[in-house]
Amino acid sequence: MKRSRWLLTTGLTFLTSALLGFAVSCGGKSEKNTGSDNSSTPPEQETVSTEAFEIKNGGFESGDLKNWTAEGEAFSALGVSNEATTDDGQENNKSGEYYFAKYAESAEGSLTSSLFKIGGSGFITFKLGGGMNVGLTYLSVVDEAERELFRFGNTAFQELNAEALIEYKADLSSAMGKEVKIKIVDNSKDNFGYMSFDDFVTYYETEPSEAFISAEDIKPLYVSAEATPSFIKNADFANGLDGWQTAGEEDCFAVEHISGGRLSNKSDYGAVGVLRSSPFTVSGTGVISYRLGMTAHPSKTYLSVKKCGTNEEVFRTHSDRWKISHGESTHLYYADLSKYKGEALYLEFVDNSREQWGAISLEAIDTVYEKLPASLKDETAFDIKYRLEDDPTYETMRETVDGVISGIEDETLRKTFKNTFYATLDGFTVNGTNYSGVLRYYENGTAFCYTGDIPAMWLRDSSAQVLQYLQFMKVDKDVRNTVRGLLLKQFELIRRDPYANAFNENGSVWERKFELDSLAYPLWLTKQYYDITGDGEIFNAFFLVTLDKILTTLENEREHKDSNYSIISEDRDKGVNEFKNCGLIWSGYRPSDDVCHYKFFIPGNMFVVSALEDIVSLLESVGLNGEIKDRAASLAASVRTAIETYGVYNHPKFGKMYAFEVDGSNADINSTDGKLFMDAANIPSLIAAPWLGYCDVDDQTYVNTRAFVLSDDNPYYYVGEYTSGIGDPHDMVGSTDNPHKDVPVPWHMSIAMQGLTSTDKAEIERCVKYMTETTGGTFVMHEAFNANDPTDYSRDYFTWPCSLYAHLVLTKIFGVNLLNG
């Protein structure tokens, strides 16, 4: 039979006089003063008021948790019992009528007593049951600031009578006169992971008798922040477990588990315990790294990062990339602890699982990085508190939107709005074919968003596919967590390859077409997320690595070289490859995924400018006012200047307006050389400039441009029997010769953007009418469609335009805006 114990392995450098001051004393005899609500009666003695030294309701004789404060779900008044025996019929050794019995083993939490002053002999006594893994279940003595002064566990635990209460005495005399509280902590969900207790007596004139077991102080080793180095002692296990503390069963973490700098306890995966590092001060960039494997059961095997003194958990994670086929191999992880710079922390590796692969492999811990790791891709450690156990329900959002839907009288509008609003989440049915929702959720809190009929995630599309949900982040945590998870996935994919536009679910590249909007859209979504939620946690070191990757890529493409990126295949023979660097950012492809004719795509440059300006504002708001903010501001300003210099034309009919693409050679506003005049459906587009944030809707250059793109002078503006709108060279309806005015092929998304950028109510309503009546009887939006025959369309399953339509209808027609008040 295994017995719980506390084993300390540490170097002499940590055995300071400050720590020795908390040593436990043994021997001697005394009587206890129980206070009015404990069962024992003190002997006659001089009348001295001991009220200040006595815990209130220390024996739970009130029949509840009066004078105690519970946090979490591990402790409740329902756990207070007057039963005389345990669940298995054995004597429980309680005192008086009541005690706190076994309760909610699978829950975590804490229970804190009233304040009392340490006095008399400094000894206290108590009874403990359960709590086999003393690294996770224990009794702390804390001061008013929650700093831990002492820690005791049920070190005499016996599995055969696990619930039986065992009597302990503890010497607190080294903290004589301090006001303190008792805090029962239960961080265990299994393996006798509960605490039962009774009869807390906190004042004795002399040391209690030898009948009590002397409780051993097992708190983490810590002196002060000033005395704490920035590195962990023996982080590479070169000296066995010197500097490390272990708790739990003796064979859970042992020197025998170390080989070649790696600790792996797989050989004893049936044992449970905790491995605790020496304290370290967060320094440098605040990033730490380690290699971690196994941890197959994240609720029981994980890494916990805690504050020294208070033991507040600031981060919990596991090896989410590990698979059974990896065996004892480890994966590299980086964790961002920069918000705790200057503070002392420690690491706890928790193994509370007896199941197969319920083990931990660990190596290569590094707690000091003076520079951010530039090679970072998907090696970020995710906090388990954001782990998505189940698919989110979006209950609050659905309740609001379903109310809107039920009030729509027009059947076609009602069906179309419902289908398009929920398309990203739930999918829809078209012509007898069921299409599922496009979001996939991961345990690490990230989310992947398919584009629809293509099994890949576009950085651009995925940002727009959640547009209709964004305002609900204000009231629905599921929406908030999904968008947060989507952003984290986008950041990861950008770090993998900033030139790629689409990725497979496993992180590999689906398509590598360099498009400016692939970098601008995630920045746009980032600002939306922050403005609505106020959550700045994701703007950590890993975000800065991502932003640096984006800025470096954009800066390089202002001086484009094929050595950085080159157009390959037959696309290189399309358009004009010659260009002149002029301060604009080079782009290989448009948001349609078609190759650019001229390589400076003006709407894409506009989007980059507005996205960077927003990021500068965000960085200021979250206090990141360093070099990276200055780089973003400088790039945005210079590109804006270049757009207004090289991207404009004084049209004889429309006046000063923006070009669609330019080659950078012509700054003459009255010349058309090297300039392409058109607009296309995919976004970013010229008509979308105010929606992108580049200019106001009443900006005169935009007003002139809008008049052009919504006229027959735009070669891709189509007028048909059922509707009119902007199309795109990238269409699969009509002939292959573009443009084809004989077969008018507008896109739903361009009509939606026309409505979103309009201030004319009649125009907005007309756009919605056009879209609602041209679904070809499918009640969802498509890509291109024949304006003379809406049943002739491309792409049944394309959720991007669905999101635009739903957002337009919800905000501009029904006026639902949770962000205004």
Question: Where are the regions that the model predicts?
Answer:
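C-terminal capping/lid segments that line or modulate ligand- or cofactor-binding pockets
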Residues: 512-514, 522, 676-696, 742-821
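Aromatic-rich carbohydrate-recognition surfaces in CAZymes
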Residues: 455-570, 798-815
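Short beta-strands within extracellular/lumenal beta-sheet-rich domains
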Residues: 97-123, 136, 166-168, 262-287, ...
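Extracellular glycan-recognition surfaces and repeat-rich motifs
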Residues: 64-98, 233-263
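Extracellular carbohydrate recognition and processing domains
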Residues: 144-180, 185-195, 310-345, 350-360
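Extended, low-complexity, turn-rich repeat/linker tracts enriched in Gly/Pro/Ser/Thr and Asp/Glu
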Residues: 119-120, 130-137, 190-191, 283-284, ...
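Extended ligand-binding clefts on enzyme/binding-domain cores
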Residues: 459, 492-499, 503, 552-609, ...
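Low-complexity, Ser/Thr/Pro/Gly-enriched N-terminal "stalk/linker" regions
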Residues: 30-31, 375-460
